[in-house]
Amino acid sequence: FVLAQNLGADTHTFSPEFSNERGTTGMHGSGLIELLAREMTNDMLAIRAAAIAEAANTGGPVRVELLTKGVSFGAVTAQANGDVNTDEVEGVGIDLVIRPWSQKGVTISMREFTINAMNHHHGMQAVERYGMTRTGTRDFDQDLVVDELTAGDMTAIVLFQASLAPPSQVIPENPDFAAA
């Protein structure tokens, strides 16, 4: 499954926390999904920053709800010294970053998702992850093809994905079919 190439054999488990379930987000409408995730992330980071500022100003703890776009992610409590208690955070990591991609929601952007997918499913490595700057070689997988996917290639692929229209419902014109 996606990202399994990053796990060693010693990680084999039957725990549901590390399952091979499928629930991967579709690519149609993915640009909108990524924008929403970024907006929600920014909202929560701003809420946390405001709580930290208020706690510093008042000299006492400030508890705030993490509510964005009608979705609650629990709460954080900021202390006057800048520490933030995240024990009440739910449904998102304590860094408050929404990661909408991959089957477990562990990938932050379509670009990261696509770099992983191109490597895992097509055996093609993006220069920005597997190229000379990061690995010291232009042919990380030693298949005799150097610089397989440039930054421009990856940008074009991600822009294509991001611009795919969201799915829509088409109601048949035949009333019998429409009623079915």
State the predicted function of each range:
Residues F1-A180:
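Periplasmic c-type cytochrome electron-transfer domains
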